[in-house]
Amino acid sequence: MAIERTLSIIKPDAVAKNVIGQIYSRFENAGLKIVASRMVHLSRADAEKFYAVHAARPFFKDLVEFMISGPVQVQVLEGEGAILKNRDLMGATDPKKAEKGTIRADFADSIDANAVHGSDAPETAAVEVAFFFPEVNVYSR
């Protein structure tokens, strides 16, 4: 497998629960390196731009409202098969359907407040990483 980078967001619900460190431990224990990280409180404009791919979907307005409801922790994860590995760690979008031991099963409350976001493909990962982190702010190690 190739070394990949993927974007991960710890959403407002998980930040409010003070579980950032526990989630970071899961990334690192799975062999993923955190090569960029920052906390940000998204503006409405930034949330709408980031999730523009979902603009026509019925959940778009609620998603934007949720994502601007509090700070988020945004990070770039790097490692072999990072995109799939992160998605496996996250679990199913609906925490009720997520496997026991996944981030969403352990920390999410609902399909809306589902603790984390992760890029779903190499193309989206590249766009999402660039949205939050100019290349000069990502450090391979």
Curated annotation (Swiss-Prot):
Necessary cofactors: Mg(2+)
Question: In which domain of life is the source organism classified?
Answer: Bacteria
- Recorded coiled-coil stretches: none
Give the keywords, sorted: ATP-binding, Cytoplasm, Kinase, Magnesium, Metal-binding, Nucleotide metabolism, Nucleotide-binding, Phosphoprotein, Transferase
Where does it live in the cell? Cytoplasm
Per the record, the similarity remark reads: Belongs to the NDK family.
Question: What name does the UniProt record give this protein?
Answer: Nucleoside diphosphate kinase
